[in-house]
C-alpha cells in the first residue's frame, strides 16, 4: 500500500462490539470514504493491557490479522480526580457491575459527599495494518460529574458528565454535538486529518 493512495474506498474493520462506538466512528470518519465493516465472527482478545494504548492495540491487531484488513479500535475511560484517576482503563467493568446503569450508580456511591467532581474522558484510537504497523491517536475531554444522571442519549458514563463550557450532560446532546467535543471525536478528528491526503508517512521504514 503506497503513501498518497490511502484507504479511500477500501474496507476497514471496526474492532468493537459496542454499537454506540460504531455509530460515532462511522459518522466521524464519513469524510474519508472508507467502507467500515463490523467484526463478523472475529472474537476479540480480553482487554488485559495496563493502558488505553495497549488495550486498543490488542483489539486492532487481532482484527487486522484475522481479517487481513486495516482495523480500527478504540479504548477509552473516565478518570476521576477524587478517585485518583479511577476507573481509567477499568471503566467498562468498574466495580464488576454488569451494565452502564449499575456502573453509574456505583460511581455516584463512591463520590457520595465528595465536593471535587472534576473528571476527564480519555480516548485512544489505533489503526492497525495486517503487516503490524500501528497509528495512534489520542483525545481528551475535561468536565464535571453530576450528582445524578441526566439525559437519555449516549452510553457509558454520558448521563453523569458535563463537559467544560457546557450546561448539558453528554447524554442530553445529539450524536453530532457530542462528537464535536468528545474525547473520541477529537481522536478520530486527528485520524481523519492525518489521512485526508492519503496515508500518513510511517515513522519507521518497513523492509520487505
From Swiss-Prot:
GO terms for molecular function: dITP diphosphatase activity; ITP diphosphatase activity; metal ion binding; nucleotide binding; ribonucleoside triphosphate phosphatase activity; XTP diphosphatase activity. GO terms for biological process: nucleotide metabolic process; purine nucleoside triphosphate catabolic process. One of its GO terms (cellular component) is cytosol. Its cofactor is Mg(2+). InterPro entries: dITP/XTP_pyrophosphatase, ITPase-like_fam, RdgB/HAM1. It catalyses: XTP + H2O = XMP + diphosphate + H(+); dITP + H2O = dIMP + diphosphate + H(+); ITP + H2O = IMP + diphosphate + H(+). Its EC number is 3.6.1.66. Keywords: Hydrolase, Magnesium, Metal-binding, Nucleotide metabolism, Nucleotide-binding. Substrate binds at residues 16-21, 76, 155-158, 178, 183-184. It is an enzyme of class 3 (hydrolase). The active site is at 75 (proton acceptor). Mg(2+) binds at residues 46, 75. The keyword Metal-binding applies. CDD domains: HAM1 (cd00515). It holds the Pfam family Ham1p_like. Binds 1 Mg(2+) ion per subunit. It comes from the Bacteria. Transmembrane segments: none annotated. Gene3D superfamilies: 3.90.950.10. Homodimer. Pyrophosphatase that catalyzes the hydrolysis of nucleoside triphosphates to their monophosphate derivatives, with a high preference for the non-canonical purine nucleotides XTP (xanthosine triphosphate), dITP (deoxyinosine triphosphate) and ITP. Seems to function as a house-cleaning enzyme that removes non-canonical purine nucleotides from the nucleotide pool, thus preventing their incorporation into DNA/RNA and avoiding chromosomal lesions. Belongs to the HAM1 NTPase family. This is dITP/XTP pyrophosphatase.
Amino acid at each position: 500500500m503506497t503513501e498518497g493512495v490511502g484507504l479511500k474506498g477500501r474496507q476497514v474493520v471496526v474492532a468493537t462490539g459496542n454499537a454506540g462506538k460504531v455509530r460515532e466512528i462511522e459518522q466521524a470518519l464519513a469524510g474519508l470514504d472508507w467502507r467500515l465493516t463490523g467484526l463478523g465472527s472475529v472474537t476479540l482478545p480480553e482487554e488485559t493491557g495496563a493502558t488505553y494504548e495497549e488495550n486498543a492495540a490488542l483489539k486492532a491487531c487481532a482484527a487486522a490479522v484475522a481479517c487481513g484488513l486495516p482495523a480500527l479500535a478504540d479504548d477509552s475511560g473516565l478518570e476521576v480526580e477524587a478517585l485518583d484517576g479511577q476507573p481509567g482503563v477499568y471503566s467498562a467493568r468498574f466495580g464488576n457491575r454488569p451494565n452502564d446503569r449499575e456502573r453509574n450508580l456505583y460511581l455516584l456511591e463512591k463520590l457520595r459527599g465528595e465536593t471535587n467532581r472534576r473528571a476527564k474522558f480519555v480516548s485512544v484510537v489505533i489503526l492497525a495494518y495486517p503487516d503490524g504497523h500501528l497509528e495512534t491517536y489520542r483525545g481528551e475531554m475535561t468536565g464535571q460529574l453530576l450528582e445524578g444522571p441526566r439525559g437519555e442519549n449516549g452510553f457509558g458514563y454520558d448521563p453523569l458528565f458535563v463537559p467544560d463550557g457546557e450546561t448539558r450532560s453528554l447524554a442530553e446532546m445529539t450524536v453530532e454535538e457530542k462528537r464535536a467535543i468528545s474525547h473520541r471525536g477529537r481522536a478520530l478528528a486527528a485520524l481523519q486529518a492525518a489521512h485526508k491526503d492519503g496515508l500518513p508517512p510511517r515513522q519507521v521504514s518497513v523492509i520487505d
